[in-house]
């Protein structure tokens, strides 16, 4: 969502964009169900407290492990800082209109897993149809975090690299 908002509001900011596991609409039923499964029932909205994070860790230990695997082992509690920073954005309703999406005139690579826990294939396809220069790739057997799905990491990076190489100006 952040990349989409920035490229819609500041069209000259980038020459290309990569959007993984996202759509232009916020808080669909599928999204909210995914959030509850991953973070636990009764998720707070807005700013998180330490008590909220303790409850999440108790209700969803797999979520803690997921974030710990993303960061350096010496920063095993960084997930708390990370979630405190992004949680308000992830839980505050915000969407882009179709008109705002259509303003994005740079090449956009949409990457998503066909088993994404937060965004359906149909939702990502809607976004694909609105973006004038979009490319869409669905990774079979992958969830939301494609780069952490066993066996899918090489494919994820190969797709990203190939897309970026095509966007670079030709060397003379």
Where are these regions (language model features)?
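Flexible "cap/lid" loop of the alpha/beta hydrolase fold
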Residues: 1-9, 13-59
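Short beta-strand/loop motif that positions the catalytic acidic residue
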Residues: 104, 110-112
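Short alpha-helix in the alpha/beta-hydrolase fold that links the catalytic acid
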Residues: 97, 106, 120-129
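Active-site nucleophile elbow and catalytic-triad environment of alpha/beta-hydrolase enzymes
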Residues: 84-100
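Short glycine/proline- and acidic residue-enriched helix-loop micro-motifs
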Residues: 61-77, 81-83
């Amino acid at each position: 969502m952040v990349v989409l908002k920035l490229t819609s509001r500041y069209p000259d900011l980038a020459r290309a964009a990569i959007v993984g596991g996202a759509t232009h609409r916020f808080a669909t039923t599928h999204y909210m169900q995914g959030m509850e499964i991953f973070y636990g029932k009764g998720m707070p909205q807005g700013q998180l407290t330490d008590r909220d994070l303790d409850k999440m860790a108790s209700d969803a230990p797999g979520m803690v492990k997921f974030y710990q695997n993303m960061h350096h082992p010496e920063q095993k509690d960084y997930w708390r800082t990370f979630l405190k920073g992004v949680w308000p954005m992830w839980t505050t309703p915000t969407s882009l209109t179709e008109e705002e999406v259509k303003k994005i005139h740079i090449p956009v690579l949409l990457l998503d897993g066909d088993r994404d826990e937060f965004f359906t294939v149909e939702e990502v396809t809607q976004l694909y149809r609105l973006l004038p220069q979009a490319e869409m790739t669905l990774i079979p057997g992958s969830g939301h975090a494609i780069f952490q799905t066993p066996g899918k990491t090489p494919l994820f990076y190969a797709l990203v690299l190939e897309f970026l190489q095509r966007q670079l100006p030709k060397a003379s």
